[in-house]
Amino acid sequence: MEFREQVLDLLAEVAENNIVKENPDVEIFEEGIIDSFQTVGLLLEIQNKLDIEVSIMDFDRDEWATPNKIVEALEELR
């Protein structure tokens, strides 16, 4: 499975919403698709399933505002 697809699948699972796959430019925080609890869950799932460690201190809502931006950020951290 392609890395981008893995990230979008993970994001859809955490968000419990496929909009993140259908519209990867959707503002996930502004639209209320992911809340603060889900954000922590997302970071844990990224570590567990993708073996990429992202500390909460490195997490920036502006840089991680859309699914596309999340994929880009994680590709840099791989």
Curated annotation (Swiss-Prot):
Keyword NAD: no
Gene Ontology, cellular component aspect: cytoplasm
Transmembrane segments: none
Function in brief: Carrier protein involved in the D-alanylation of lipoteichoic acid (LTA). The loading of thioester-linked D-alanine onto DltC is catalyzed by D-alanine--D-alanyl carrier protein ligase DltA. The DltC-carried D-alanyl group is further transferred to cell membrane phosphatidylglycerol (PG) by forming an ester bond, probably catalyzed by DltD. D-alanylation of LTA plays an important role in modulating the properties of the cell wall in Gram-positive bacteria, influencing the net charge of the cell wall.
Disulfide bonds: none
NCBIfam families listed in its UniProt record: dltC, PRK05087.1
Keywords: Cell wall biogenesis/degradation, Cytoplasm, Phosphopantetheine, Phosphoprotein
One protein family per Pfam: PP-binding
Organism: Staphylococcus epidermidis (strain ATCC 35984 / DSM 28319 / BCRC 17069 / CCUG 31568 / BM 3577 / RP62A)
Gene that this polypeptide is encoded by: dltC
Record lineage: Bacteria, Bacillati, Bacillota, Bacilli, Bacillales
Residues that bear O-(pantetheine 4'-phosphoryl)serine: S36
One of the protein's GO biological processes: lipoteichoic acid biosynthetic process
Superkingdom assignment: Bacteria
Protein modification: 4'-phosphopantetheine is transferred from CoA to a specific serine of apo-DCP.
Protein family: Belongs to the DltC family.
Protein name per its UniProtKB record: D-alanyl carrier protein
